């Protein structure tokens, strides 16, 4: 139940606060965490499974969780991570909405693992697409089998757009080129797959105008805004959230780097009417979930 101080949240994108949840990531060791620590001003202090669940309850949040870097792993290790995530979800269904599945679509065993997750995973299961995987940008042929699996299952695909925190501030940016996160790839995937629900993840800066145009043009495109304080949203995004994008935007946090409590306070600072915030925090997500048949 929402209160004046703690609204009910459906968080369409956060990560794990547990050490196990960072297995396989570029930040698995303490030395590798310094760049991320500086970018988010987050101390990288981990919590237990139970502490994580309690933090979500305190925030009144139901969360879509993302490992992000499982595409780099051998398939047996990927399956172990997914089983860990699914066990956590089954023990804490009140705070876990579901999971974004990140795989390497060039590996047939990874594609089979996605198929298993879509079939057996608890809650909402969707595919997370990163352009820096071996398959390249999401409009490349290597992604087609996975996109079709999601379309057939009636489950969404998350395509990351805009500036990435991964590699930010490091020499060479960990080899990641930002062009691969241009909204043009959301536009292309949505056009080719009109029966596929495509969610653009993050604020799309420095291409926010293109992302707004894509969301307005394609009825199968939504936006979730994890990883950014609303204080720093581009001006045109701030304006359109209360206007033409009002029904197209989902709340996303990026826990544990950004806490739910901080983001709620900063959303409220922007001066949106209460009914607009209700749509962003829960209403739009509830309508979307009802449309795809997820409780």
Language model regions located:
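Alpha-helical scaffolding within the catalytic cores
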Residues: 47-53, 82-86, 110-114, 183-186, ...
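Active-site gating/metal-coordination segments in enzymes
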Residues: 62-65, 72-167, 295
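Catalytic pocket-lining loop regions of alpha/beta-barrel enzymes
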Residues: 121-126, 135-250
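Short, flexible/disordered intra-domain loops and linkers
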Residues: 26-28, 41, 74-76, 167-180
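Active-site environment of divalent metal-dependent phosphoester hydrolases
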Residues: 17-20, 71-74, 105-109, 163-167, ...
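Mid-to-C-terminal alpha-helical segments outside catalytic/metal-binding sites
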Residues: 1-15, 19-58, 63, 245-250, ...
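Short aromatic-enriched loop/helix-cap "lid" or pocket-rim segments at secondary-structure transitions
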Residues: 20-26, 113, 169-172, 211-213, ...
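Conserved, mostly hydrophobic/aromatic
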Residues: 13, 85, 117, 150, ...
């Amino acid at each position: 139940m929402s209160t004046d101080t703690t609204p009910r949240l459906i968080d369409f994108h956060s990560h794990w606060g547990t050490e196990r949840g960072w297995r396989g990531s570029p930040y698995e060791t303490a030395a590798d965490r310094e760049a991320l620590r500086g970018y988010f001003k987050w101390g990288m202090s981990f919590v237990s499974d139970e502490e994580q669940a309690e933090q979500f309850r305190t925030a009144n949040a139901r969360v879509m969780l993302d490992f992000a870097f499982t595409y780099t792993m051998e398939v047996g290790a990927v399956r172990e991570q997914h089983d860990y995530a699914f066990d956590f979800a089954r023990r804490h269904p009140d705070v876990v909405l579901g999971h974004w599945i990140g795989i390497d679509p060039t590996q047939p065993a990874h594609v089979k693992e996605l198929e298993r997750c879509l079939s057996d995973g608890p809650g909402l299961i969707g595919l997370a697409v990163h352009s820096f995987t071996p398959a390249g940008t999401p409009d490349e042929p290597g992604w087609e089998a996975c996109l079709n699996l999601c379309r057939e299952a009636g489950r969404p695909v998350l395509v990351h757009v805009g500036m990435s925190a991964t590699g930010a501030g490091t020499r060479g940016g960990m080899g990641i080129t930002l062009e691969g996160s241009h909204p043009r790839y959301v536009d292309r995937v949505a056009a080719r797959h009109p029966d596929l629900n495509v969610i653009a993840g993050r604020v799309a800066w420095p291409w926010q105008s293109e992302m707004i145009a894509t969301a307005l043009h394609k009825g199968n495109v939504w936006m979730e805004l994890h990883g950014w304080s609303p204080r720093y949203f581009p001006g045109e995004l701030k304006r359109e959230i209360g206007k033409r994008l009002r029904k197209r935007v989902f709340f996303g946090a990026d826990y544990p780097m950004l806490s739910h409590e901080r983001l709620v306070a900063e959303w409220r600072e922007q001066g949106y009417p209460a009914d607009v915030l209700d749509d962003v925090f829960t209403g739009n997500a509830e309508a979307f979930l009802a449309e795809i048949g997820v409780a």
